[in-house]
Amino acid sequence: MSAPHSCAMITGISGQDGALLAAHLLGEGSDVVGTHRPGRAPDLWRLCELGIGTHPRLRLVALDPADAAACAEAVARVQPDAVFHLAGQSRVADSFRDPQASIAANGLSTVNLLEAVRANVPRAHLVLASSAEIFGAPQHAPQNEDTPLAARSPYGLSKLIAHAAVASWRASFGLRASSAILFNHESELRGVVFVTRKLSLGVARIALGREQSITLGNLDAQRDFGYAPDYVAAMAAMAAREHGNDYVLATGVAASIRDFATAAFAAVDIVLDWFGDGVDEVGVERGADRVRVRVDPVFFRPFDAPLMVGDASRARRELGFAPTLDLAGLARRMVEADLERETRST
């Protein structure tokens, strides 16, 4: 994908990963066609914040990936060299409320795009945004490409269906198809429904005196938090390879939600001390005796794997993948971005 004048198609371009990937590919000289949901105006704030909202080599088209005929028509018309399938239902919590919608949005859509590529651009490389949720509650850490797949949540199952479809089309039809097994990857462009952005925005508002505290769910859940631009660069590198494969993208370092909260508050020079257990735990600002973090079980997931941490050795070796921010740097970057946004909004 580093060759000029190549054309990449990105489903879900208005999301965090889609916008970051579009900026990366445009910077490499590629033409980019991004898809958005039909029947509504695309939300372009991320593209605009990245300075590419009106880029001359960026074109937006409406597409429902769950519509097989529409997928075939779009791929035939665009004739992309690479298809990055990033669209879909992206929140684990939402999948428990509507499992069928999650499976259709993530599983069926992948099959539709695989078939569209196979029929119309068989030499194109399809890259799927898979998920560490396909591992379920793994017995061993860290997880790699050979870790048994045992999805537990409906979201995990939907991603497992998509992941298995990519492997099947690769083996059965010789398609150039790869899956990026994405562990948690965050950035300034993360949606506010995700806990890391909820924290960065909440911390910014607390620092500005606009809020007093943040309410979270399970503080003990441990995740592997990376910086999203590193992950989309690895996906672009996957598309440039002659043959498809599966790649874990992760930092290899686990941190709890409590750790992320501590790092986010540290970015505004607030030190948290933690008291209590379970739903009674609170994070208190040292020296001010103010409760800044509370726990509410309403934010607990029905199932939450206690420890998810990835081994990205294959991606490091074959793609040159190298995480650039540690937890403190990631939290600081997100908080500083939200401080700037909140200051501008006054």
For the regions a language model picked out, list residue spans one by one:
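N-terminal Rossmann-like NAD(P)+-binding domain of SDR-like oxidoreductases, especially those catalyzing
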Residues: 1-185, 229, 239, 334, ...
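Amphipathic terminal alpha-helices
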Residues: 4-7, 313-314, 325-346
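Residue-level signal for the nucleotide or nucleotide-sugar donor/cofactor binding architecture
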Residues: 66, 97, 105-108, 146, ...
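Hydrophobic recognition helices of helix-based DNA-binding modules
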Residues: 117, 203, 264, 268, ...
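NAD(P)-dependent short-chain dehydrogenase/reductase
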Residues: 139-142, 160, 164-240, 252-273
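Conserved C-terminal active-site "lid" loop/helix of NAD(P)H-dependent oxidoreductases
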Residues: 228, 286-322
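Non-catalytic, hydrophobic alpha-helical segments
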Residues: 231, 235, 249, 260, ...
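Short mixed-charge
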Residues: 268-290
